[in-house]
Amino acid sequence: PEYKEKLQSLIKKLILDNNSYYTIDRVSNQTIKNILIDIMNNKSIKPLEVNGTKVFGAMDRAVYFNGKDGKVVVSMHSSRVANFETMNGENIKGWYTGDGMTYIYGKDSSAFTEFWPTVDDYHLPGVTNSLNPRGDKSGERRMIGFVSPKSFVGGVETGREAFVGMDMISWNKQTEMKKSWFMIDGVTLAIASNIDSRDGIIHTTVDNRILEDGKIYLDGKQLKEEITIQNPKNLSINFNENYPDENIGYKIVEAPEVVVKVTENKGSWKDIGGSSDKEITKKY
């Protein structure tokens, strides 16, 4: 009873926010469906307002809602939390999902639909990693004695702003770095510093998202083909999707090189440990 009203408000918000499909239509249990219908029809239940920041210290995660339908989630690991988990033959390529992967959500609730079977697992947004080939299920740091030796991972937040930091060493101890995120005033400032590696080519992926009909703009000019920019300063990259007022923007303050391109990725759930071998194609 103590949490009932808040949970009902959260449920209403989640159903209303889903612009991909109507959630209740996909609920087969009639008892649960009736409960959800009652919540949606009850005008005294208001959708939960979620804004600001939250650092989940016990699970090395940080979340930021900017009040304009933008959300940023940072996924990390440490001496307390595994870098990723694979079992029962599932998530066999989840290598970098806890290495600072940064999820950027806009208004489109289908933005990550069929993301995992089609994304290039060496180019996860927010991650700095080697391009050397990995074996399936390799590098899991979950069991006692195998977790990262780094404990300086987490952050502080006021409910409106947050500072998040990650002292990181790679699964094979060949790459070390410090990653920082400042979340304030509708902006997330991401910094990768003190990068030291002996593991071949190291790169950072700013974003890697399903495009559908979206367009990419560099300093106001629409991207027509793959482009490589040497030593960019204050480069603006903007992305819009299916909503006319939506814009997800990036500012590259400084970098040795930036590559921007559109690719067509193919894959199946079976490729990453699922059962379906149906080929899926997505534009990124």
Task: State each model region's role.
Residues 2-284:
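Extended polysaccharide-engagement surfaces of secreted carbohydrate-active enzymes
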